Amino acid sequence: MCGIVGYTGTQNAAPILLEGLKKLEYRGYDSAGIAVVQDNHISVSKVTGRIAGLAEKTDDGKLLPGMTGIGHTRWATHGAPTEPNAHPHTSNNGRFAVVHNGIIENHMDLREELTRKGYHFESETDTEVVVHLIEMYYKGNLKQAVMRTSARLRGSYALGIICADEPEKIFAVRESSPLILGLGIGENYFASDVTALVAYTRNAIYLENGEFAEITPDCVTIFDCTGHTVQKRISRVTWDIQAAEKGGYDHFMLKEIMEQPRAVKATMAPRMKGCDISLDDLDIDLSGIRNILITACGSAYYAGCAAKYAIEKLCKLPVQTELASELRYSDPLIDNQTLLIVLSQSGETADTIAAMRECQRRGAKTLAIVNVVGSTIAKIADWCLYTWAGPEIAVATTKGYTTQLTVLYLFALYAAKKLETVEDSTWRKLLSALKALPKQIQQALDMNPGMVHLAKKYHSACSMFFIGRNTDYAVALEGALKMKEISYIHAESYAAGELKHGTIALICEGQPVIALCCNEAITEKTMSNIVEVKARGAEVLAVAFRDNAKIVSLADDMLYIPKIHPLFSAAVEIIPLQLLAYHVARENGCDIDKPKNLAKSVTVE
């Protein structure tokens, strides 16, 4: 959601803060601001809209001199996207400034208390209570004020705090919202995401819940909630900063679509040992598992839906999928014979973390599949498998989805061999089919030039329907999400067999229907649905294998993918749908990498 950065050192802080905020744009935001300490005074600049406007307002930071500062990109939760609601927020006496990512759940009670005590509020946000509490508790010791303030807060928060009276010092506080410290020489940093730090340092410390840090140019000291110092391991950030640049592509999304063969290979190759699969240090006693539950949000959830069929078929275990935002409030039948598989690109998705903790409380064993090393989900899981996708900057996930599928497919084969639920000869054929995945994804990507023509045909549609059965339906879910989130065209997915149970009433002349027809065992059933919608005037764009002549005779337009084993088809089927969504959005002039109202990492509920 929001992004925060901080710097203290020997350079002017504002340009560094602006650059860090630019690296956090992909998280989604509607306003931005920075605050800098100079000559025992705090200067603040805020704008609604893009960071480019903030850079222009401050002359790229030159109008805000000072070597200690904090910055923020806001995604509105409490209060409209206005300058008064933008961060940083300052105290009534102007001596303190705060940036915040998260939600203060008890802000209404705190606001009433502070108002009674004479504090004046300039904004509608939950964050402003924090800076007034700090002012109230400050008696010449910022550390003590921060501790007393944190003890009053309920909710999730990552805070950055500066004080005009202690101008070379920043306090950073974490509670259920990611916060990373960057270590330099004569300068130090913090940010809500490592992407804001790698241009300046590769040495990072990941704060845990309940910890806070005192940051000066020469020293970083970390404390627990009682104020005792904590020794932390320094992590080395290994990925190349060039991976977070566009590299000649017009958009990060297109770059990341094109990176999928490499990302899938990077995720797969270290885990394939000849004719065997080795899943890092995974040591689950699968013989004691009676059911598997997959939980996630958004595209990660749809990856779980697609992989469910492979895991269930190969492992002969019942597999359920449940949205994390629903699972956390349900009463699931979970015990110590349940394996919970948790998917999250960022490893910081708030609903997923909450659902995971609830299932752990009930005894479930937990396996995390995440992309960000050292993230919260990775740390609290019993086991973790990383998707080596590299940084994903575009808000709409692409390589994150396909690498999650890859790990799930690897797990399905690994578990099937351990459980002896698949014959050896069949297992070897499946392994060979999985090894071909990067090549087949590349072949699907080769259709990119032809997408422009289809985008010109379909970009003016008011709505689109995506249909399929079984795995094809799971892919339809993700395809519809891609279309709606970046092109702003209403797109819905339906199990093809459900069309006649209501949805077919919406089919009219010229209505685009994207039909997924890659599961040959049930293709004829989907063909009957194509005939039904065609009879009512729909324009059908079908995704199928090239040798499927029957589909060609029915569809108005075709998207071909290479032949692939049906258990693994989702990772290839999704490629043309990603490309179609990208080119439709481009035709419509949409902000492809940063769609309106969306955030890359949803760290609040």
Regions found by a protein language model. Name each.
Residues S287-K429, A433-A436, L516-L559, L580, ...:
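Glycine-rich phosphate-binding loops that contact phosphosugars or nucleotide phosphates
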Residues M1-K246, D250-H251, R262-R290, Y302, ...:
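Conserved short alpha-helical segments that host acidic/polar catalytic motifs at enzyme active sites
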Residues E539, V552-L554, Y560, I564-E605:
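Generic C-terminus detector
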Residues M67, G71-P84, T267-I284, A307-L343, ...:
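Glycine-rich oxoanion-binding loops at beta->alpha junctions
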Residues I4, V36, V98, I161, ...:
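Structural beta-sheet core signal
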Residues S156-E187, L454, H459-E485, E520-I522, ...:
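Acidic/histidine-rich
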Residues Q260-V264, M268-L293, W383-P512, I522, ...:
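Active-site phosphate/pyrophosphate-binding segments
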